[in-house]
């Protein structure tokens, strides 16, 4: 069922991948991603753990109404989260690449 390496080989691969995934998650948490809204007038930078690091608001928006600025900040934050999640998927795909899984089995389980 598991081929030449047997179950022991699969378990060893899984352990190695778990170690690589943990290391990758630690690296991802340190990376920063910036989301934008209003054609770059509002920028929100978050880390890989989705913690907000910085918010930049173009001074020209300070004269506009408060509700619009709040909406732009929320949109920029959501854009940053989306970008962070895409980055995480790409990084984690590199960790699982090359691992031989039984047919139909996918990571994460």
From Swiss-Prot:
Taxonomic source organism: Actinobacillus pleuropneumoniae serotype 5b (strain L20)
Protein name in the entry: Nucleoid-associated protein APL_0075
Reported function: Binds to DNA and alters its conformation. May be involved in regulation of gene expression, nucleoid organization and DNA protection.
The keyword DNA-binding is annotated on this UniProt entry: yes
UniProt keyword annotations, A-Z: Cytoplasm, DNA-binding
PANTHER family from the UniProt entry: NUCLEOID-ASSOCIATED PROTEIN YBAB
Domain of life from the UniProt record: Bacteria
SUBUNIT field: Homodimer.
Gene3D superfamilies xrefs: Nucleoid-associated protein YbaB-like domain
Localisation: Cytoplasm, Nucleoid
Region feature (Disordered): 1-21
GO terms of molecular function: DNA binding
Skewed-composition ranges (Low complexity): 10-19
GO terms for cellular component: bacterial nucleoid; cytosol
Family label: Belongs to the YbaB/EbfC family.
């Amino acid at each position: 069922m598991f081929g030449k390496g047997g179950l022991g080989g699969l378990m060893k691969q899984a352990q190695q991948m778990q170690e690589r995934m943990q290391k990758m998650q630690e690296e991802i948490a340190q990376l920063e991603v910036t989301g934008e809204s209003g054609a770059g007038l509002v920028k929100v930078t978050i880390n890989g753990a989705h913690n907000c690091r910085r918010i930049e608001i173009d001074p020209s928006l300070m004269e506009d109404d408060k509700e619009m600025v709040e909406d732009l900040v929320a949109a920029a934050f959501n854009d940053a989260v989306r970008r962070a999640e895409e980055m995480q998927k790409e990084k984690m795909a590199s960790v699982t690449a090359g691992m031989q899984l039984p047919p139909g089995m996918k990571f994460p389980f």
